[in-house]
């Protein structure tokens, strides 16, 4: 069996993201995320204290060749919040930076 290196794992309590297995856990329980939700989660975990613009999220997750509506970011953030937040209407993990984008944490 392949062992996963520590660098392949991000821990931001109560979450653990394992890049080798492409799995995200919350309090040890595996979350059922879509490919896009996983990529967004990974981006936030790689940049825990940085506010990210919608465009940065779009370019990283969808790729620079994506020419759709930037609102797709908001839609997927909302879906992700429903899965990871204790209360999606009052998020504590992914916060909105008004007029800018999103940030991990408050």
Which residues does each predicted region cover?
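Positively charged, aromatic-enriched patches within helix-turn-helix-type DNA-binding elements
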Residues: 21-23, 28-93, 97-100
């Amino acid at each position: 069996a392949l062992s996963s290196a520590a660098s392949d794992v991000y821990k931001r309590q109560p979450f653990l993201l394992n890049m080798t297995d492409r799995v995200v856990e919350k309090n040890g329980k595996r979350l059922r995320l879509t490919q896009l939700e996983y990529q967004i989660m990974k981006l936030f975990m790689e940049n825990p204290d940085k506010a990210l613009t919608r465009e940065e999220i779009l370019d990283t997750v969808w790729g620079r060749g994506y020419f759709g509506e930037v609102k797709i970011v908001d839609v997927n953030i909302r879906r992700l919040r429903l899965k990871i937040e204790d209360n999606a209407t009052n998020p504590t993990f992914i916060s909105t930076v008004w007029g800018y984008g999103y940030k991990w944490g408050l």
